Amino acid sequence: MSKSFYGYIRDAWKNPDETYVRDLRWERLQVWRKEGSVTRVERPTRIDRARSLGYKAKQGIVVARVKVRRGSMRKSRYIRGRRTQHTGKNKITVGKSIQRISEERAARKYPNMEVLNSYWVGEDGKQKWYEVILVDPSHPVIKSDKNLNWICGKAHSGRVFRGKTSAGRKGRGMQTRGTGTEKTRPSVRSNLNRSKK
């Protein structure tokens, strides 16, 4: 059976350092570094990945490329006339993944849209880039799309801020079932509060 066009793109992105993606990325990152934190793009960089996550080239769907710093939290050293014994600064990390942070930043940039999903497109020593797929739930084209109109319901309002996207569910431990996950459902916080009642 012959491989499709998307199949060749998918194979190239599996090992981006060994294929033609390496040269493309070298050129793209020079342009992306000069852009802002959230930039709307005309079409997805990885069309195969975008389509597998629900992207369609139609009205009401937007793709935004988000630039986020790599590493820990970048906490600043405060000067308040004293020295605390346990100044948390260097090894403090955020409880969210960088991909989840990028989704939330895109959602704040476009408050009338909901985040459908996101995927990695590049990184260097300082930053990571993700492309976020956003959907307008009030657009008539989206409302009439049987594959996407579920996002128009009130239950999916602000879904990215409640950890309902794929990256959010992964960070909450929802991808795993069985032994060792007894305290993850419905959430770590609500499971902790069960003993206080």
From Swiss-Prot:
**Polar residues bias located where?**
186-197
Keyword Metal-binding listed? The answer is: no
InterPro entries, from UniProt?
Rbsml_eL15_core_dom_sf, Ribosomal_eL15, Ribosomal_eL15_arc, Ribosomal_uL23/eL15/eS24_sf
Task: Name the keywords, alphabetized.
Answer: Ribonucleoprotein, Ribosomal protein
Gene Ontology CC: one annotated term: cytosolic large ribosomal subunit
- Ribosomal protein as a keyword of this entry, yes or no, is yes
Q: Which SUPFAM superfamilies match?
A: Ribosomal proteins S24e, L23 and L15e (SSF54189)
Give start-end positions of Basic residues composition bias: 163-172
Report the record's disulfide bonds: none
Q: Where is this region: Disordered?
A: 163-197
Mind listing the GO molecular function terms for this protein? RNA binding; structural constituent of ribosome
Q: Which GO BP terms sit in this record?
A: cytoplasmic translation
Among Pfam families, the record links this protein to:
Ribosomal_L15e
Origin superkingdom: Archaea
Task: Say which family it is in.
Answer: Belongs to the eukaryotic ribosomal protein eL15 family.
The record ties this protein, via PANTHER family, to:
LARGE RIBOSOMAL SUBUNIT PROTEIN EL15 (PTHR11847:SF4), RIBOSOMAL PROTEIN L15 (PTHR11847)
UniProt-recorded name of the protein? Large ribosomal subunit protein eL15
Q: Which organism is it from?
A: Methanococcoides burtonii (strain DSM 6242 / NBRC 107633 / OCM 468 / ACE-M)
> What is the primary gene name for this protein?
rpl15e
